[in-house]
A protein has these predicted regions:
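Contiguous hydrophobic, helix-prone segments at protein termini
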Residues: 1-451, 455-456
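Extracellular/luminal Protease-associated
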Residues: 1, 456-473
Length: 473
């Protein structure tokens, strides 16, 4: 019997990275890319709230590698990742092969195992250059200007932040707060990101590390580069050394909080209070320093001793390169100090943005639920449009579910479901490849094998006692 069938067809919809109703983020769904959160996970160890991610969107304005449909920075389950597929594709367009690009990116984004294939963007060299070069040239020009302003920014930022936090507290109307955001906060916040980006561009470490490894071997190269602070301390070490000074009575509590109260393990997340906001934080930290057998300043001195020994060996073995390498080490050290100081002040500005969000929450009656709105949605609320507030309960629930999961793999290839991955008892914590091993961890090594190989965070099995830290604190 003949039958007539009606076949209905429709285009396959491209999955969206973000659902604004629920606050679910998953950029791994938008294409077959390789993502890494190395370095990112140190700066942002928490699942981000919508407010925090919208803050990072402002940073993206200072990044030249954005192509519609191919994000450079994405969010997977609330955590930020960098799209290595895009970076390697752009390197290929500039004539740099994939192996070289992998090597050059190791210091900043970590090592990608040789066994992992990095898919590239399906665009020709000409298309990539046409799409990216105009933005790259524009951003490069802006960064050259910013590099000349970094030191002035570092010098003036603390007073500006103190003034702005006080002004925010004195605002009593939505219209006034919107005006303050547009005239003062948003421009300076964008400038802070540009300063941080420009300081990062000044990083000369990668090439020097490669040259030192070739000349002196990995161990001595690490020793020579472990003392970049030299006689002048890196800003990233100041809070730790400062705690020791407070514990010994060499620094007042007030001075410590004024200088370092904006720094902490959660400084890039808007919803979490800064140390200076918690009256018990410093007491707890000082008590911990007194109990701890670890002395930060002694550890730094140990690094200096290791540096001196490695440098003497270098002088004996490579006398012709001593002067040039010494100059390069000095330049790298100066660059590192500038970069860390700029990052510290950018973190101080982020505290001001947190104060802005809290004030929005006060004026709108939202309290800390305000962090489940984006910065643009906060401005809408201040202007009388409260439509986004209906999404807050679902976004809060999504954030809670993401936060209950263990940290995701450092490297992700292809589509990744964080909940399915977390449910697998043999999941890998270093790598997820949807096209190969997926969530499954490798088998334990054969008996008698005592050497562990791999890279930081690599999967493997070894028996012993460890202290487990699920999150920074």
């Amino acid at each position: 019997m003949n039958r007539l069938y009606s076949l209905q067809s429709q285009p396959i919809a491209t999955p969206q990275a973000y659902d604004p109703l629920t606050g679910e983020w998953n950029h791994s769904l938008v294409g077959d890319f390789l993502w890494t959160n190395s370095n990112f996970c140190e700066a942002i160890g928490d699942v981000m709230t919508p407010a925090t991610w919208s803050m990072w969107a402002i940073y993206m304005e200072a990044v030249p590698f954005e192509i519609p449909g191919y994000p450079l920075i994405g969010v997977i389950g609330g955590r930020p990742y960098i799209n290595m597929s895009l970076l390697l594709s752009f390197g290929r367009a500039l004539g740099i092969d994939g192996r070289t690009m992998r090597k050059r990116s190791e210091d900043l984004w970590g090592r990608i195992p040789d066994s992992v294939d990095v898919p590239t963007i399906p665009l020709s060299r000409g298309q990539l250059l046409r799409l990216m070069l105009p933005t790259l040239l524009r951003v490069r020009k802006a960064l050259r200007v910013s590099k000349g302003e970094i030191r002035a920014f570092i010098a003036t930022c603390p007073r500006w932040c103190d003034t702005m936090r006080e002004r925010i507290r004195q605002v009593h109307s939505g219209a006034e707060l919107v005006e303050l955001w547009r005239r003062e906060l948003r421009p300076t916040f964008g400038r802070a990101w540009r300063m941080g980006r420009a300081a990062l561009e000044s990083n000369l470490l990668g090439r020097l590390r490669r040259d030192l490894v070739d000349l002196a071997g990995t161990a001595d190269a690490n020793a020579l580069l472990s003392n970049l602070s030299g006689s002048e301390q890196l800003a990233s070490l100041d809070p730790l050394v400062g705690l020791s000074k407070v514990a010994r009575g060499e620094m007042s509590r007030e001075a410590y909080l004024q200088q370092y109260g904006h720094r902490g393990a959660h400084e890039m997340e808007l919803s979490i209070p800064r140390p200076a906001e918690d009256p018990t934080w410093l007491d707890w930290q000082v008590a911990a320093v007194k109990r701890s057998p670890v002395d930060a300043e002694k550890l730094l001195e140990k690094q200096r001793v290791a540096f001196d020994a490695a440098w003497k060996r270098f002088e004996a073995q490579h006398s012709r390169q001593v002067r040039s390498v010494r100059l390069r080490l000095e330049r790298v050290a100066a660059s590192a100090r500038l970069r860390e100081a700029a990052r510290s002040e950018a973190a101080r500005v982020i505290w001001v943005i947190r104060e802005f969000a809290l004030r929005v929450g006060d004026l709108a009656g939202l309290g800390e639920d305000v962090f489940f709105l984006t910065l643009d949605e906060m401005l809408d609320v201040l202007s009388g449009d409260d439509a986004a507030q209906a999404c807050i309960p679902a976004r809060r629930e999504t954030h809670s579910r993401y936060s209950a999961l263990p940290p995701y793999p450092a490297i992700i290839r292809g589509r990744f479901d964080p909940f399915a991955w977390a449910a697998d008892p043999r999941r890998r914590s270093d790598l997820y490849d949807a096209h190969a091993s997926g969530t499954t961890a490798p088998a334990p090594p054969a008996c008698g094998v005592e050497t562990i190989t791999g890279f930081a965070g690599a999967a493997g099995s070894v028996e012993g006692l460890v202290r487990r830290l699920d999150r920074p604190r």
